[in-house]
Amino acid sequence: MESADLRDPDGMPVTLSDFEIDAAGRLSADLLAYLEGGAEAGQSVTENRAAFGRIGLLPKLLSPCAGGHTRTTILGKQAPHPIMVAPMAFQNLFHPQGESATAMAAAAQDATMVLSCQTSTPPEDIATIPGRRWFQLYMQADHEATMALVTRAVDCGADALVVTLDAPINGLRDREVAAGFTLPDDVRPVMLDVLPQPPRPHLRDGQSVVFDGMMVFAPTADDLARLIADSPVPVIVKGCLRPADATRLIDLGAQGIIVSNHGGRVLDTVPAPITQLAAVVDAVAGAVPVYVDGGIRRGSDVFKALALGAQAVLVGRPVMHGLIVDGPRGASQVLRRLRDELEVTMALCGCATVADITPDLLTGFSGTGS
């Protein structure tokens, strides 16, 4: 993390790292651990950012950029820029208006917001706020319960589903445990709380709580195919790191792939998504759009992701930092700062449009390709 803690003349943080520093000073130890912590030792959280730093920029000269722009296409619709708001649970932990405040910020910057399945604000309330939204979905043990979530989300304006597959169970978050984080009684997953809960398996002596208990309800390929067939809106799958998984997901009907490691919050020592992006893009071969999240803190990071084949990027924790510091205005400033930095990076690298951002403008990059 950059640590200058810069302020503008009005006393507001300047960069995304400055927002992060300010936000940390406003949170209790347990809330800070929940927001910033990762799985186990948190190596993947650190690596998500560090991986961008190992990729350099190689600008080209004498490229006309007058009249340039950041416009792109996201699921067939024109977007003014390729920056989206990632799904984040329980935003009422960080602002009284929770997800509604984030929706206001996203709308102010014309950014698509992905609403979490674990939203602490009813989607009906968020639907009153203008803007484009997708809905992040954890598939339920019962298909009817899953479709009830889908129907409610679509009725509230979601025009795509983001099915998260990399967290069939929770990871081990040591930092949260040490800080004593528990969800307060007045912050609940309001969409999940109203669903019937499946009976828990009765475990015999010697059976595993994980394998014989929790994983009994994990989604299968057949479950995903059925959801895709029944969904009234496109289904994008989040949590893919392996090229072979990407091609299999497309075979099952996925209409987009998000390369992600869940912000390093589920399994530690998995690779940073940016290091896997090019290999996944190559495997997909243009069949569906590919998106990426994880560790993006600068407009130059957005540029690097686009150069490696991402259609757009998703940003999570920085939006919460902005929300903590100054509500919807702060979150909006975070998104605007990223876009401004992207424009400057494009101009200085000789790119008038996002279509001009190509891999030859990067140096020092080596993906795993596995």
From Swiss-Prot:
Keywords: Flavoprotein, FMN, Oxidoreductase. Pyruvate binds at residues 34, 138, 173, 262, 265. It comes from the Bacteria. Pfam families: FMN_dh (PF01070). It is an enzyme of class 1 (oxidoreductase). Binds 1 FMN per subunit. Residues 8-367 form the FMN hydroxy acid dehydrogenase domain. One of its GO terms (molecular function) is FMN binding. The keyword Oxidoreductase applies. FMN binds at residues 87-89, 116, 136, 164, 238, 260, 293-297, 317. The keyword RNA-binding does not apply. Coiled coil: none annotated. It catalyses: (S)-lactate + O2 = pyruvate + H2O2; a (2S)-2-hydroxycarboxylate + O2 = a 2-oxocarboxylate + H2O2; glycolate + O2 = glyoxylate + H2O2; 2-hydroxyoctadecanoate + O2 = 2-oxooctadecanoate + H2O2. Its EC number is 1.1.3.-, 1.1.3.15. Its cofactor is FMN. The active site is at 262 (proton acceptor). Catalyzes the oxidation of (S)-lactate (L-lactate) to pyruvate, with a reduction of O2 to H2O2. Is also able to use glycolate and to a lesser extent 2-hydroxyoctadecanoate as substrate. Homotetramer. Belongs to the FMN-dependent alpha-hydroxy acid dehydrogenase family. This is L-lactate oxidase. It comes from Roseobacter sp. (strain GAI101).
